[in-house]
UniProtKB/Swiss-Prot annotation:
<keyword id="KW-0597">Phosphoprotein</keyword>
<dbReference type="GO" id="GO:0005524">
    <property type="term" value="F:ATP binding"/>
</dbReference>
<dbReference type="InterPro" id="IPR043129">
    <property type="entry name" value="ATPase_NBD"/>
</dbReference>
<protein>
    <recommendedName>
        <fullName>Chaperone protein DnaK</fullName>
    </recommendedName>
</protein>
<keyword id="KW-0067">ATP-binding</keyword>
<keyword id="KW-0346">Stress response</keyword>
<comment type="similarity">
    <text>Belongs to the heat shock protein 70 family.</text>
</comment>
<keyword id="KW-0143">Chaperone</keyword>
<dbReference type="InterPro" id="IPR013126">
    <property type="entry name" value="Hsp_70_fam"/>
</dbReference>
<dbReference type="GO" id="GO:0051082">
    <property type="term" value="F:unfolded protein binding"/>
</dbReference>
<keyword id="KW-0547">Nucleotide-binding</keyword>
<dbReference type="InterPro" id="IPR029047">
    <property type="entry name" value="HSP70_peptide-bd_sf"/>
</dbReference>
<comment type="function">
    <text>Acts as a chaperone.</text>
</comment>
<feature type="compositionally biased region" description="Low complexity">
    <location>
        <begin position="604"/>
        <end position="622"/>
    </location>
</feature>
<feature type="region of interest" description="Disordered">
    <location>
        <begin position="604"/>
        <end position="625"/>
    </location>
</feature>
<feature type="modified residue" description="Phosphothreonine; by autocatalysis">
    <location>
        <position position="201"/>
    </location>
</feature>
<dbReference type="InterPro" id="IPR029048">
    <property type="entry name" value="HSP70_C_sf"/>
</dbReference>
Length: 641
């Protein structure tokens, strides 16, 4: 069995790790970086860029560069959070036929967020394969603890599209706790809090790490969070401030200019990062836009104090879930041994200060906030693969699950913070006399009124024997697997008729759509391979042409015109072939030129009485093959990263 890799599929950055020699380690990508921007771009010539190369060209291609799509995954277009995001991104977000939020390129090609995420997962998969030297097919992927069922399903679908069998979906704070806890050599029992403020989501989990009969047990006591609170929101506050200041000064609203918006996004992110270590920075964007009077430049000073005032409300928003999680766990802040910070946004001093004030203790600084989650996912992969022993992980469901009952009431069957996997059943009855069928409406959330909770699915149980209302007994059973994904069944206890469903949210991709996307991804991988082979053939042909021209310059005067004529003709044919996309033609014309080059050297050698004047033309090209391959690798990595 191959390695089960661990992937932190982040809103802003992603990271991949494996178990290596009994320890989890992060793998560097083809650019030598330990994290990869979760950005995908589509260029005019149809090329797909992922990671750093996509980020580099974002300013010149804003409408076709997709970032932070994790905030859209598993969501409806009409969700308030999605509507809020539309105002802040330069690319198009639109409604799919089933009401889901999808994205579109400037030429109106529609894509699901799962497809975009799959491109990032493919990059992570390839990073692991390059390091291991073998094919990777299995992964543990992390999600925010507060992701609902639809968002978890959508993440699994993204894995399938990327060619991965997702063995487990694991919550990000739990993964970070695994990475932290396994690193501790002692067997001391401790209760810890993981405060995870990432690029797009916020989670807080209270976790007990205990030694039980020689086994390290990680039990999640409570979790809470906000799936639309993260570094992107901090960036947006800075962008709004810069836009308002520029509008006051110049009377121009930069929100209407996608190119300016993308430049502002980059500048806001840079300024925010700089202000974690500096007290003041300057946002300087020359030629940010223009009007009838000429080009306009943006130059605004931003202090740390101003940034903190802009995001103060967001930081406060992250503290309330901490209070709820502690309360749900039945603990006080004094019961907590350690506070672990995860996610890039926790590097902000004001965030660290707020966490310190609430929990009454300094958070740990020895956990890498960008890598801990991927390391934990790799450890869970090791547990599933049998490489890591004596570790037991007990996670929880973040939100209550239940059904809609008479009067629009939400009746909970499984309460939030229940350890998973778990099963629970409850018996219900009919609301009308002689009712022969019931509709089971499955929901997730905490509100008493069903309509305010997240609708997961509806299904019918028919064939109930006619009887007065209240007499038939319908048993509804909920079963949550280790991924936090729900299976529901309804059974008439008298007739034993049963209806079972694995919850596939009313939103989400159909099996046909997933199959199409998997096929598209496979086709693209084949296209990429062909493209690489074509570029390699062109590079080798180019080296051969260079070597042959050098040979003509050096030895042309020593041989007859007919020999030179054949070489020149072969050169012209190869140069023509190189302008096309036929790899076989380029290779065939290269062979003809090699043979013509050998004739040139043979003739020159004969003129000099049999002494070879130098390497043959074929070898002149071949001698550089390794160099050309290295050049190609760099080009490929830059363009395909």
């Amino acid at each position: 069995m191959g390695k089960i890799i661990g992937i932190d599929l982040g809103t802003t950055n992603s990271c991949v790790a494996i178990m290596d020699g009994g320890k989890a380690r992060v793998i560097e990508n083809s650019e030598g970086d330990r994290t990869t921007p979760s950005i995908v771009a589509y260029t005019k010539d149809g090329e797909v860029l992922v990671g750093a190369s996509a980020k580099r060209q974002a300013v010149t291609n804003p409408k076709n560069t997709f970032y932070a799509v994790k905030r859209l995954i598993g969501r409806k277009f009409t969700d308030a959070e999605v509507q809020k995001d539309i105002a802040h991104v330069p690319y198009s977000i639109l409604a799919h036929d089933n009401g889901d939020a999808w994205v579109a390129t400037s030429d109106a090609k529609k894509m699901a967020p799962q497809e975009i995420s799959a491109k990032v997962l493919e990059k992570m998969k390839k990073t692991a394969e390059d390091f291991l030297g073998e094919k990777v097919t299995e992964a543990v992927i992390t999600v925010p603890a507060y992701f609902n069922d639809s968002q978890r399903q959508a993440t699994k679908d993204a894995g399938r599209i990327a060619g991965l069998d997702v063995k487990r979906i694991i919550n990000e704070p739990t993964a970070a706790a695994l990475a932290y806890g396994l690193d501790k050599g002692d067997n001391k029992d401790r209760k810890i809090v993981v405060y995870d403020l990432g690029g797009g989501t916020f989670d807080v989990s209270v976790i007990e790490i205990a030694n039980v009969d020689g086994e390290k047990q990680f039990e999640v006591l409570a979790t809470n969070g906000d799936t639309f609170l993260g570094g992107e929101d901090f960036d947006n506050r800075v962008i709004e401030y810069l836009v308002e200041e520029f509008n006051k000064d110049q009377g121009i609203d930069l929100r209407k200019d996608p190119l300016a918006l993308q430049r502002l996004k980059d500048a806001a992110e840079r300024a925010k990062i700089e202000l974690s270590s500096a007290q003041q920075t300057e946002v300087n964007l020359p030629y940010v836009t223009a009007d009838a009077s000429g080009p306009k430049h943006l130059n605004i000073k931003l202090t740390r104090a101003k940034l903190e005032s802009l995001v103060e409300e967001l930081i406060r928003k992250s503290i309330e879930p901490c209070r709820v999680a502690l309360n749900d766990a039945g603990l006080r802040s004094s019961d907590i041994s350690e506070v672990i910070l995860v996610g890039g946004q926790t590097r902000m001093p004001k965030v660290q200060q707020a966490v310190t004030e609430f929990f009454g203790k300094e958070p740990r600084k020895d956990v890498n906030p960008d890598e801990a989650v991927a390391l934990g996912a790799a450890i869970q992969g090791g547990v599933l693969g049998g490489d890591v022993k004596d570790v037991l992980l007990l996670d929880v469901t973040p939100l209550s699950l239940g059904i809609e009952t008479m009067g629009g009431v939400f009746t909970k069957i499984i309460e939030k913070n229940t350890t998973i996997p778990t099963k629970a059943s409850q018996v219900f009855s009919t609301a009308e006399d002689n009712q022969s069928a019931v509709t089971v409406h499955v929901l997730q959330g905490e509100r008493e009124q069903a309509r305010f909770n997240k609708s997961l699915a509806k299904f019918d149980l028919s064939g109930i024997e006619p009887a007065p209302r209240g007499l038939p007994q319908v048993e509804v059973s909920f079963d949550i697997d280790a991924n936090g994904i729900l299976h529901v069944s309804a059974k008439d206890k008298k007739t034993n008729k049963e209806q079972k469903v694995e919850i596939k949210a009313g939103s989400g991709l159909s099996e046909e759509e997933i199959a199409r996307m998997v096929a598209d991804a496979e086709a693209n991988r084949e296209e990429d391979k062909k493209f690489q082979e074509l570029v390699q053939a062109r590079n080798q042909a180019d080296a051969l042409i260079h070597g042959t021209r050098s040979a003509i310059t050096e030895h042309g005067s020593k041989v007859g015109g007919d020999v030179i004529g054949k070489v020149e003709a072969a050169l012209a044919d190869l140069e023509t072939a190189m302008k096309g996309d036929d790899k076989a033609q380029i290779e065939a014309k290269s062979k003809v030129l090699e043979e013509a080059g050998q004739s040139l050297f043979a003739a020159a050698s004969a003129e000099q009485g049999g002494a070879a004047p130098g390497a043959d033309a074929g070898n002149a090209g071949k001698a550089q093959d390794d160099v050309v391959d290295a050049e190609f690798t760099e080009v490929k990595d830059d363009k395909k990263s």
